[in-house]
Amino acid sequence: MHRYRSHTCGELRASDVGTDVRLSGWLHNRRDLGGILFIDLRDHYGITQLVARPGTAAAAVLDKLSKETVVRVDGKVVSRGTENINPDLPTGEIEIEAAEVEVLGAAAPLPFTINTDDGVNEERRLEYRFLDLRRERMHRNIMLRSAVIASIRSKMVALGFNEMATPILTATSPEGARDFVVPSRLNPGKFYALPQAPQQFKQLLMISGFDRYFQIAPCFRDEDARADRSPGEFYQLDVEMSFVEQEDVFQPIERLMTELFTEFGNGREVTSPFPRIPFRESMLKYGNDKPDLRAKLELVDITDVFEGSEFKAFAGKHVRALPVPDTAAQPRKFFDGLGDYAVSLGAKGLAWVRVGEDGALTGPIAKFLTEENVKVLTERLGLAAGHAVFFGAGEFDEVSKIMSGVRVEAAKRAGQFEENVFRFCWIVDFPMYEKDEETGKIDFSHNPFSMPQGGMKDLEEKDPLDILAWQYDIVCNGIELSSGAIRNHEPEVMLKAFEIAGYEAETVEREFAGMLRAFRLGAPPHGGIAPGVDRIVMLLADEPNIRETIAFPLNGNAQDLMMGAPTVLEEARLRELNIALRKPVETKAADAKPVAEAVHPDAAR
């Protein structure tokens, strides 16, 4: 028999009754019923119940052991009997009569329990992450991640893509996020950077003559944590394709996402094909560029209705209406509750009216609406008896942010929100440029390296604020999974694009010398995308925080509490690297912006 096990703890069934077996695992739980010990033994594969009778050698050993001790147990498979079957366990029809027990790894008192998923402080969990990962939910999440990545690889190869590796040590990037830098011992005073993404390398692979590239790429960015963003490092499905237009990129990625979320979605519906929603339309209808389409409500821009109005709360402001059917009969606390929610998002309040059976509008602002206002709103919003309408007014960005949140919350409270579904969409037609409201200067709105939709002609002839870019996002349930773009591979078009944003040609030539040199030696049209693996798994696992899908994440302050990183280097190490440390000083943001201050081309915004 094998030194440690003949079977796993998730393997034995009723057909194995009478078999002598050897199991190894962790003591998950124990119960003492009249001197008879019942032990749940757990390994990676499952749980098997052990029984140790009073007076046996096995009972003498097991009685002294604490939870999470690692043991090897020899015994015989016996039936539990019909009345004692545990239907929640695949091994629930049998148990092991323990005959011999060997302690393989003793466990000291635990900092928290493993066999329950009670609320333990996240910092504590991260400090003892190896214990946290023994918990069923966390173990399941990490195994889901493993299966998802394996499936992605298989599907990408089937779609004709080739997996290629790109460097981890590279040059510092002029793009928006901060780099993690690595000193070079062999080149004193010089530094490598860990890649924010393989962006330039994957484009160079296309220029090298390869056609369909992918990798599960580690990316490193020194940025703050969010619920859907882990500080330090993350992984993305990095993709690039040659001789493609926008729809050529959409086709394989949409197929991949549909198959992947169908495979791992536990029966949740996956909506396909994915709708294409222009950026401007998304901002007006949903209040943001990552709409949660499970909310079956849409905002309506009614700014023009109140132009010149005497109603000061709306006059001269951007005004958005949210019609909600079948809510007029809701009690006042329903309306007040949504108002409180809007205030939590930064609003001063939330105006509303409801439509009675006679079609008349009632509510706090009804008296301020003229007959013409009521007529236009009824027609434009499709109002009918039972409807309620919520209003937001303010600066465009402000009212968009607030009403996007109100839209989703109202849908949830009014029964207009779909459960158990993955609703994907593509956001397209991003503006190439935007105006800084304070300085009046034109700058890139998102990705400075994408191709303008009209090429050089649009750059030379159109108002910059009217130029659209071949940029796109893929969004699922309000989570942005990735940005992507058709790349600007023509040097003169790129220089012109940067010129419009106020960058001198020699600055661009200096900062992007390597890419421009490659573009001038025969570059094909190419484009790509990079969906975040962590966010994909977060959605599939239905977890609210991305750190729940990563085996060993940093905490919100970019610290590894388990390994004690970052650490202080000894003076000898610093000397070897020719590094002298200075005391930290408070710094102010530099007046001059870096070149291409926008986020990385395929970064989730």
Per-segment meaning from a language model:
Residues M1-R605:
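Class II aminoacyl-tRNA synthetase catalytic cores and aaRS-like
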